Each structure stands twice: as structure tokens, then as C-alpha cells.
């Protein structure tokens, strides 16, 4: 039975339909209401061990004035009936009704067999951004917000998200308590609250962008348009865009993301008194003060040194011979290089007989700092361009956001503009590095296909874009400059650096003089931009509510770690205090002063599991946080069990099934799905590549025998020397 509710009261279908007819519509025939959709599902294996998934409740939320209407049911036939009701009441066809779904890709796998799709738009398979079905449009609210539902509710102050016990096997025939139904309705209520705010902010629902970076693009374009002639600005941008497939492909292959790596000589060791430095707003900082390449031209590959000395921006395809890391830091990524006989450090190259890669002049500078090269490299392709600052109004659009984010933080009554500035400045990077040439993603009868775009046609379309205001090479250089800033500082500190990630460094010893000199250089560069473009100092040096100057792009000092241990990129744990194993009260509640960051594992799940196991084995969680630990057992390795990991393995199925099933209460009913997703909780373990494992064993033997030392000021402890950070 389909149920209709107004807030918490059950109403008739007739009363709901009356409200549908009263919904305002824009001149472009879009209904101006916030509407959301969600389903709850159960996964199980049948008696033959086959994977199954079934929907046991679906729900819509619909906002009218200050009221929220809900519709929910238990079967797909009921859902199809409601879709027909919506089509009829809203007279869909030329008129459009937008319904938001958080993580549309999941719901899409269930609903595509229950309705005819007229259009599907996706950037990659299984991740539709929106789908259309004769006037009914489903959009993904996750792509728009870039938040999980729980974080969206917390950040925006919406209704708090509650969790059902998903381990319970529920079917469409399972009686649901009022509390369980309430949990289901909260999810769609959060999205309706969010979309109501977005409609208010944008004016109409059709003006809401598809993704979070769409807001950043719109903001920057509007800012530029309000300060200069946009046609003249865009003409200058079009003049410098890559105009040949060779140049574009060279740029695309030279693009590299953030640098994250652990010093192999510190990997697996509990370090004490670790200093933490953060490079504030890394990407906006380099965009506002660094110079970027403008129009590229092809150049003589034998003249690389000449162009470097002239201070030109350079793109190149280059081969290095006999390349070998000078220190414990390996910076070149194996997957970005073609190599012969490489020695690898967790995906980073220590040495190679021959190495071919596509890089910028900034990468070339860093490579020469961190590697020795046996003989002169061979440059195969070379393009050069002049370095200039980004256009003033593009810089100012970013600085305005930084100023707002800094000055409005914690100001009572300014929470909304602060959050908007924060979200926009966080999207500036994504906006700048978006690849303008996208493959076409097709969906046919349950199968996703990728059709590569024609580069020549794509570049022509890119050049003619009405909303163009950045050049693709600028995005390539944004990450190149950010890596250069990070690695240049790492190079100066040396082997005291334990770990670095994008815009942060964890190191032994304070190295105050190095960070101070880096900050002096950065402030000098900021001043040069201010003088060049006549920019007021307050934009680079805004003040917080406490009247403290917060200069853009400086290295800031974060609280010191009392203990820190890394097992490689995106794998580390730490505590701020000696007595981390004693629960203490903080603003976040009562908890242990022990924290964990592991890619693919929730911080809360990983921490709770380690604490639980440390109590079981009566050892420190720092000891448990390892690939293997023979002190506990000969085959122990850190593993978070399925019930604690919060991770699931998802499989997508397009084969229909119909079978008898039994729920957790013993109720039997026939379940039927034409397409579905099966999700199964899985354990999480700290795996390690055999090559990396052998490397670490070699390093540890060298440390234990005194063969390797970080530098003249640092003596690494011998492995097993002392039981650091043990529970007392």
C-alpha cells in the first residue's frame, strides 16, 4: 500500500495531488519544488549461495511552502504506480520535474528496468550525474554537494541522519516499526532541506549546477564578467588553448596529482615528537601568486637547457638514463613512466636504467634535485611558453573567497556565507583541472560502454565553449606548482621528513629556519603580485575574528604528535599525548587520544577496531598497526573484521530473479527483482606488495646494523630496540 504523509500525519492521495497541481512552475517549464527519492535494500545469499539484493522500502519527499510531504511504499509495482501519478498530476513531458537522489548510481541500477530512459549523462560508467524519462529528471545530489549524507546534514545544520541496522534481513513483507520508517524518511528529508536552500540560492531549480565545481565555474565567470568585457577576456583565452592533439596529449600526460609518500627509512617505526606543518590553501595560493604558461609553441628538443635558463614554461617528453635517488625520498611515480629495470619504493621509483616520461619544467627541476642521472637525458618532444600571472580578475575572484572564508569563520550570523566561500574555494582546484575532453559514456541494456572522444573535434568544441575562462595548461601547472612547493621544502629538510601528503609535512626536529625562509619567500612573491596588479594587502593577508593575520599560502605549525607511525602513503596513526590509551573528555566527546588515517577505511572504524584488538592482546595499538607482528603471533597482521570495517563489496546484476525468501523474523514471501545491487561487508587488511615488503626488510636490516642514518642530526632507532608507546 502506498502511504502519503504531510509532515507526520497520514493524508489521502487526493490531498497530495491537490498540492502537486498548486506547485509553481518557471518560464522554462521546471517545477519549483524540492523533491528527493531513496530506497532501502537488503543483500543476502540464497540457499544456492547466489548473490541477491532486494528493495524493501522506497520513499519520496516533496516540499511545498514550509511543509514536507512524504510518499513511501514497499514494492516496485507501487513505485511504478506513483511514477504514473506524478506524470499525470504534474503533466510531465514538456513540463519537467527534478528529483534528487544521493548517489544516483546506486538507485539507477534498481530503477532502470522499471522506467524508460530518454537520456543518461555520466562522466564514467556506473556514475550517472542525471537521467531523464519523459519530463521526469533524476539528478545526483552527491555530485552537487560533494558530501556524504551524514556530513551534508552536519555541515548545513539539517536534520541529523540516523542509521538502520543493515545487517538485518528485511523484505517487502517485513513489518517496519515507526522508528524504522522514520529513519528511512530522514534521508529524503535531508536532501529536500538541502535542495530548498539551493533553489533559494540560485533563484530557480533549473539554475542549480550539476556538480559542486559548477558553482566555482559560475562564480569565477560572473566575477570576471562584472569587472571586464567577457568577450574580450574569452578571446584572449581561446588564443592560448592547446590547438593540436600532440600538444593536448602531452599536457594531459604531464598532469600529475598531489604527491603523497612515506620515507622508507621511517616506515613501520613509531617516531616520537613529530612536527606537523601545513601549507595553507595550497592550490588557491599557487593560483594567485605563481606564474603560468600562456601560448605554447613547438621548439627544438636540443635546446632544453637554453629555454630553462630563459625562464620559459616547458612541456617535454624526455628519457633519463641511469637515474638513481640521492636520498630516502623517491618522487617519480611508476605508473607515469616507462622504465627499464626499475627499483621501486611503494609505487615510487628509486632507480632505473632507463626512464621515459612527460613532465613540466617544474618537474624537471625537482627530478634533478632528488635524483642523480648517469648521462645526458634525451628530449623527444619540446613545447615552450612564456610565464605570466593569471588574469587579474581570475586571481581576484579567488582572493575574494579566501578573504571571506578567513574573516567570516566563527562569526555569528555569517555561517551561510562562510560555508559558501569555503565550499567554493575548495572547488577552485577541481574547476581548474577538469579535462575539457570527455569520453562519451553509453548505457545499453544494463551494460556501460565508453566511447573515446576524437581529440581534434573535442579541441574545436572546447575552443568554441561559451563559458570558457581558463586554459587547460593552467590546471596542469596548478598541481605542478603545488608539488614543487612541497617537494622543494622536503628537499631542504632532507631525511628528517617522515611523511608528506599534498600540502603537509611530518618531520623530526622543528627546522624552524627552513620554514621561516620558505615563508619569507612566499610573502615576497605575494607582495610582487600585489604590486604588479595593484591588489590591496588585505586580500592576501585577511584577519580572523580574533584579529590575527592569516596570510595565504604560508607554512603553518599544527600541534605536535607525541607518537607517529606510517606504513606508507595514506597509512598512518598518531597520538598527541603519552597517555593516549586513557579515555579523556574533549569537545568531540569522551574517547582515546589515538587516531588513524588509512585510505579506504573510515577513521572511526579503523580506530575502534585497533583499540578493541589492543585491549584483547594487551599491546599498544601502535604495535597492532603493522603489516605483520610476530610478537603477537607468527601470522598476525592488522585486519579489521567485516562487522567493524564499514566496507562493502558491491556487485551489479542485470539478471532478473524471482524466489521465496525468509526475513529475520521468519516471514516468508516471494521477492522479485529485474536488476539489483548486492552489497556484502568485507574485512579490511593492510596488504603490502611483496616488492615493498622486501625493500622495507632490507632497510630495517640496514638501520639495525647502523648502515643507514637519516642525516647527521638524526639517529633512527634500531628495530626492536625498545617497546615504544606500550600500554601500561
Question: How would you describe each model-predicted region?
Answer:
Residues 39-41, 103-104, 141, 279, ...:
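Residues immediately flanking
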Residues 151-234, 486:
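Acidic, Mg2+-coordinating catalytic module of metal-dependent nucleases/exonucleases
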Residues 38, 100, 140, 187, ...:
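A residue-level signal for conserved active-site and pocket-lining positions in enzyme catalytic cores
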Residues 45-49, 103, 108-115, 194-195, ...:
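A short acidic (Asp/Glu
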Residues 67-171, 175, 182-186, 190:
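Conserved DEDDh/DEDDy metal-dependent 3′-5′ exonuclease domain
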Residues 199-267, 295-297, 324-498, 502, ...:
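C-terminal, non-catalytic extensions of nucleic-acid polymerases
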Residues 37, 139, 269-283, 421-428:
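Conserved catalytic palm subdomain of right-hand nucleotidyl-transferase polymerases, strongest
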Residues 2-99, 110-130, 245-270, 279, ...:
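Conserved RNase H-like, two-metal-ion catalytic cores of nucleic-acid enzymes
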